[in-house]
A protein has these predicted regions:
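Cytosolic juxtamembrane helix and N-cap/initiation of the first transmembrane helix
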Residues: 1-14, 39-43
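Non-cytosolic membrane-interface motifs at loop->transmembrane helix junctions
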Residues: 4, 75-78, 101-110
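N-terminal signal-anchor/start-transfer transmembrane helix
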Residues: 9-31
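Core segments of alpha-helical transmembrane spans in multipass integral membrane proteins
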Residues: 16, 42-67, 83-88
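Cytosolic, membrane-interface loops and tails of multi-pass inner-membrane proteins
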Residues: 25-44
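Hydrophobic alpha-helical transmembrane segments in multi-pass integral membrane proteins
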Residues: 56-59, 117-126
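Hydrophobic alpha-helical membrane segments
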Residues: 78-93, 112-120
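Membrane-helix boundary connector in multi-pass membrane proteins
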Residues: 90-108, 124-126
């Protein structure tokens, strides 16, 4: 897979995820945690907005770089940097269960994030 295409795929998906977090943070919180106490609080929604903004930023950086860089070492560097960011996000989400903050790990990020990481690694290393 070409690096530019991988950056655009990962960029588009992460922008959509970030938008979902920002458009309906309360709904997303309820999807993840159920109807628990505080799920619709302003603080929890504000946290979701900030997390979504970070994910959107990562996606927009990938899209921007895919449009402004030529295929080569620079695009590989962007993809490996994206892997580092996504892996950090993945570990942070998973650690919530192991640290006792949640009773289960949300399924969607445990599927989407490794898939995006695999796309980046496959393209950068290929």
């Amino acid at each position: 897979m070409e690096n530019i295409l991988a950056m655009q795929i990962v960029g588009a998906i992460t922008v959509l995820i970030g938008l979902r977090m920002n458009v309906d943070p309360v709904g997303l919180n309820k999807d993840i945690f159920g109807d628990v106490e505080g799920v619709d609080s302003g603080e929890m929604s504000a946290s979701r907005l900030a997390i979504g903004g970070g994910i959107m930023a990562l996606g927009l950086l990938n899209i921007y770089c895919s449009l402004n860089l030529d295929e080569g070492p620079a695009t590989e560097t962007v993809l490996i940097g994206t892997v580092i960011g996504l892996a950090t996000f993945f570990v942070t989400i998973a650690s919530a269960k192991f640290r006792g903050f949640t009773s289960e790990i949300p399924k969607l990020p445990m599927i989407v994030l490794p898939t995006l990481i695999a796309i980046c690694l496959y393209s950068a290393m290929g």
